[in-house]
Amino acid sequence: MDEREPLDAPPHPAKTKDEVVRRAFAMRALVYRVELELQSQGSNFAENQVATSMVRETVVPALQENDLWDELTAFEQQTLTKPVGSWQPAELFSLSWLSESLSVLIWSLGILDELQPWDTMMDPSPVLTLFDLAGEDSGHWVSSVELRDAEEIADAQFAAEIWHWRGRTQAMLLGLIPFQAPQGQRADEFLGPILQYTAEEAEKSGILRRIDGDFPAYGQPYRNARDQQFHLLMSIASERHHALNWLVGFGLKWDDVSMDT
């Protein structure tokens, strides 16, 4: 992000309520499949076979009958139907964060009152029972919800962009992303003033409250985050940023969303 200027206007229209609801239902199936994969680590082969049959004979047909199958990306379709217990670690890691994106969609529909702080994972479990593909009550809540005001969603998108930018900047400082500071400066010498300015402006905008001139994370300055804490911060920001960019129109489909910061 250049001098904290917002991105250009989204190239596509913002998503409608119907589009958000459809994607949320499809993602619910994926989150359920993730739960089965996690449970499979303590299950035997026969139990995993039963779970696989249930996905293929119940979940997939329900998605198809409700015209939701094509709401999933090709990768999601392929991974959803793999035998339970067969996912590679990278697949499990990639899809295990979808509950964060799903929570953003649930929030955008007004079902969740607020998003969690940016160092805290969302817990969608209280409302996941709403997403029963075969449930008779699904139509009732779908007809009763409305998308939040466009300005409120845009504000959340900008906050996500800022937090994702902070994560990427931290990755540069940690040497996880290649970065060459100009004029022979060290990365921290060049990026430090930009970080301080950004944190100050973000505080003025009400996005955060600084700690020692930096973004707050786990009660400390963000720059202190390392290892698991840092990866958690990055994953939260990335998933929310993806969902919010999709909502406001930075991509027609879920898998072609621009994630520039």
Describe the function of each predicted region.
Residues 1-261:
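Extended, charge-rich alpha-helical interface modules
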